[in-house]
Amino acid sequence: GDLAVMVGGRIGKDGIHGATFSSEALSETSPTSAVQIGDPITQKKMLDMLLEARDRGLYDGVTDNGAGGLSSSLGEMAGISGGVRIDLDACPLKYQGLAPWEILVSESQERMSLAVTPAKLADLLELARRRDVEATVVGEFTHSGRVEVFANKTLVGLLDLSFLHDGVPTMDLRAEWAAPTAAGPVPVPACDLRRAMLDILSEANVASKEEWVRQYDHEVQARSVVKPFVGVGRDAPSDGAVLRVRPESARGITVTHGICPWYGDADGYKMAQCAVDEAVRGHVALGGDPEQMSALDNFCWPDPVEGPDNPDGAFKLAQLVRACRGLADACRAYSLPLISGKDSMKNDARVGGRKISIRPTLLVSLMGIIPDVGRAVTTDFKAPGDLLFLLGESRGELGGTRFERLAGSPLGEGPSARPAEAFRLYRKLHRAMRRGIVRSCHDLADGGLWAALAESSLGGRLGASIDLDAVPTSRETGRECGREAERLLFCETPSRLLVSVRPRDLARWMRAMSGAALSRIGEVTADEQVRVTAAGREVAAIRIGEISRAWKAEGGVAP
């Protein structure tokens, strides 16, 4: 008896077969019409109206018209009521000429389907009118046990719910995992250290993304406290964003991400754990509370189904299984709930007769609470004389790192996370931040210690002097393989952060971080030059101007 109501944007030919499109290999003949034409203004008005309608209890159920459009949203909701009757003639269209099946399956993110009690319909329609949102009754939920679709007063579609929801047999897939052969640290090839440091900053995955980011508005409603770029020139990277949600409250939210697909070449488990740690690490680096955070997972995978054209499908599926286990284990360790997610399992294309597949990739996006946005911490160094501390042990892994890609040869095992240890460290750091002890904080990710050091110096337009002999290491660092400077500067061991502290706060800082793996590795300087020493001698000195030019990819290095 509930009415099926569609709210939001009108239906068009865009977004037809979008779900099918995302599950097939791309080619030169893939239809552009499968991609939805976004309308963010319509979507925003619809979402605000729905929140108000929810608070007033004007609907009993809601789902989006994403993959599959009305066929999916109303078909899913019909599983609760026991059936649905859909009238395609009532559906508002962008233009005439759509076939009934096109109206039924066109998908969009700015359309939603509601279940509305008839007695509340008038109030819902009036609210939608006042909020300038189109709302239309397009059917009725029934007990027929079927999805009935009508167009031009004629029944054009009829499916039993049992077939719709359970009619497709479950696939029986084979996953085959071959663990990589354990190997000790691989000797680092000789290189021009200074040149390598600049090339790391110019590498496409490390270099500035300002040209892209500035195309988007990150000042909406003046709520952004920490923006994508920070520092005196507003051109150094942040570890994420901090937003003030309500003007009258100091509480805010952080938004961070974690993604490291190259680590997955050897093991999807390690990749997933490192992605979670990177998102959590960025949240904590901004001043976020590690006890208050949530995340969503986005899996982007090459076809994991074995077949004649996909002989390694069983391994790709095993990587997916490993990644799911790594994600689950890391989230449990951090008490991190996954509140949403998405997957795309057919990221393959044929271009000029050649098959191209993406790497197995997991993106973790995190939103958490920062108790006081006034205590938010940014990556840029603040003043000469501030003391530099490196938190977390460096284990010297170079596999899958930016440096390995520049070296052009395998450099051993990739990074692996230890979430339980990291969580203890993050709690201690957060307590120190709440006390106002931390001046700057930057997580170590792509490019390792060197990239973090260079970016923080660039942000403050201040130099730094560090001693690699002081870097906290574990027995796994691989010092016996030589080239220690490269290993310590460029390894991407997770759960590490670069922190600056005022000299007068040193005692408070050490008390707050008692028992944590950390070491004082240097200090901030006024000479706009980053100096690195090892074994009692200077191994590199690079000026801020050179760092800026390299990081902004003026003549940068391709990925």
Label every model-predicted segment.
Residues 2-559:
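Glycine/proline-enriched, intrinsically flexible loops and inter-domain linkers
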